Regions:
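C-terminal nucleotide
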Residues: 1-112, 127-166
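Conserved phosphate/anionic-ligand binding catalytic regions in large, soluble enzymes, centered on
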Residues: 114-123
Length: 166
């Protein structure tokens, strides 16, 4: 995986708490994507970008839940990809290998793709048709090789009703 500074997640936590204190809210959930710009002058550019990611991500989660109930998982692609762009641009939680894996997945027909894991550690998931799996694996492996990166590991997962306790 991608090596991250051990303090990455704790730094983002501190940044988030500073924004909460500066804005006088209990949580960034108290803000909406429409209300956040009203507070821009109270925050540094970096703090604003961090808050923007969190506030918009909260909205994306709500939108994703609605889409899953109404349309199905294939419709999540745009939200996943927007989430990744925000993680990369506003939260600084990406790396060239991650971007390459996502760009390659999208170019090979993935509905969407996003980094997952605490601290941006380098795991990416892509929402694809199962028929495209082999082509996607070959394409990502080839792109990594072409750029001098170690071959990534691939884990195939599928949808389920959720974790079950037996």
């Amino acid at each position: 995986g991608i090596e991250r500074d051990a303090d990455f997640a704790s730094k983002r936590y501190v940044e988030r708490e500073e924004v909460v204190d500066l804005l006088g809210v209990t949580s960034l959930r108290d803000l909406s994507p429409k209300s956040l710009p009203d507070h821009r002058d109270k925050l540094s550019e970096t703090s604003y970008r961090r808050a923007q990611h969190i506030v918009n991500e909260n909205q994306r989660v709500l939108d994703a839940a609605k889409i899953l109930r109404q349309e199905g998982p294939e419709s999540l692609g745009e939200i996943l990809t927007a989430s990744q762009a925000s993680l990369r641009d506003d939260y600084d939680a990406s790396a060239r290998e991650i971007d390459l894996a996502i760009e390659t997945a999208l170019s090979q027909g993935a509905f969407g793709a996003r980094i997952v894991g605490v601290g941006g550690s380098g795991s990416v998931y892509a929402l694809i048709n199962s028929d495209d799996l082999s082509l996607l694996q070959v394409s990502v492996d080839g792109a990594f090789s072409e750029h001098g990166f170690a071959a990534p590991s691939t884990y195939v997962v599928g949808p389920s009703r959720g974790a079950l306790r037996h």
